[in-house]
Amino acid sequence: MLSPKRTKFRKQHRGRMKGVSYRGNRICFGRFALQALEPAWITSGQIEAGRRTINRYARRGGKIWVRIFPDKPITMRPAETRMGSGKGSPEYWVSVIRPGRILYEMGGVSETVARAAARIAAYKMPIRTQFVTT
């Protein structure tokens, strides 16, 4: 699963997901894409599950580009721990997604195959998405 090799700081604030995505909201590499319509955190496991389903469905001559990367650590405290004694340890990584962000791009396949692959990958995502073309 995806995670940064090294970061400047081990822990981050949770932050707020306001507004729409102005970066990464256009198709750059392929002809078809899956675009987010809601704000959310998408975990590295969800990104990998979507990538695998697209690869499995569009394996004949198609190319996939994953346009998001999980760079935010999410901390959790051990179960049945008393309050206090600092912030928990990092458990998993997420990518902060705002509306309009391109999640995956596809090229080298027909539109029907790309649309079907994007629909299957959209079931793996915790947000509403839409299929877009160039």
From Swiss-Prot:
Domain of life: Eukaryota
Cellular compartments per GO CC: chloroplast; mitochondrial large ribosomal subunit
A molecular-function term among this protein's GO annotations: rRNA binding
Keywords: Chloroplast, Plastid, Ribonucleoprotein, Ribosomal protein
SUPFAM superfamilies (alphabetical): Ribosomal protein L16p/L10e (SSF54686)
Pfam families reported in the protein's UniProt record: Ribosomal_L16 (PF00252)
Protein's UniProt name: Large ribosomal subunit protein uL16c
Signal sequence coordinates: none
Species whose genome carries this gene: Pinus thunbergii
CDD domains: Ribosomal_L16_L10e
This protein's encoding gene: rpl16
Gene3D superfamilies named among the record's database cross-references: Ribosomal protein L10e/L16
Membership in a protein family: Belongs to the universal ribosomal protein uL16 family.
Location relative to the cell: Plastid, Chloroplast
InterPro entries referenced in this protein's UniProt entry, alphabetically: Ribosomal_uL16 (IPR047873), Ribosomal_uL16_bact-type (IPR000114), Ribosomal_uL16_CS (IPR020798), Ribosomal_uL16_dom (IPR016180), Ribosomal_uL16_sf (IPR036920)
UniProt subunit comment: Part of the 50S ribosomal subunit.
UniProt GO BP: mitochondrial translation
NCBIfam families xref list: rplP_bact
